[in-house]
Amino acid sequence: MHHARQEKAAASKPAFDGAVWSCPMSKLMDAYEAAWAADRTPLLIDCTTPSDAGAGTFSPLETFFSYSSEAIIELKKAVVEVSAKKEKTVAQVQDEFAQALLRALKQGQMLVLLCANAAPPFRTKFSAPHALPAELMDVKQVKPVLGADGKVEGAWAEALIHHADTEGWPMKDITLLAKHGILHDNFRVVVVTKFKLEDYAEFLRDEWPLELMQPIKVFTES
């Protein structure tokens, strides 16, 4: 039985070529590395939801992220809180984004932006120099600020750290960043959408810089 499962997994090979890559959940780390090497931000097209699942259910991929130690930002939830329920202001959710981002930068986490089946207004509403800088989507601008040799001063990360330090958030990570300015080498950014492969570009292109991203169809091994 175990041997049969191994054979099935081996048959589900990732394909990191062409306009849209294809990758089983178990090989995502390989996909991240390939996209990083190609200077592209991974845009995961989540195809892991079973066909008989309800519309509002978490997909296996979303569940995987929820149990991971990565920095998760639920952008669809933020849209609902700001626009539908009006429970929070844009400034409030931006501060939440900034805190998650700062922790990820200090601890070397992956910043996972979950869009679900929505087109969150990244460019026109949520992105800001002190919260979710637009440069996060450009690997060529992320790489130079990371690690001991990274140049934070004058780069996009400087405004983010300065704002947090000025606000006096009680976060040890911010104090360390403000004093030493070293951003962890392992920091990465991933965006996840549940739009279908044939639909994602139409829905996301106005708010997200798709030209800087690598679409990756993610599936579960069967």
Regions flagged by a language model, labelled:
Residues 1-222:
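Conformational switch/transducer regions in large eukaryotic molecular machines and scaffolds
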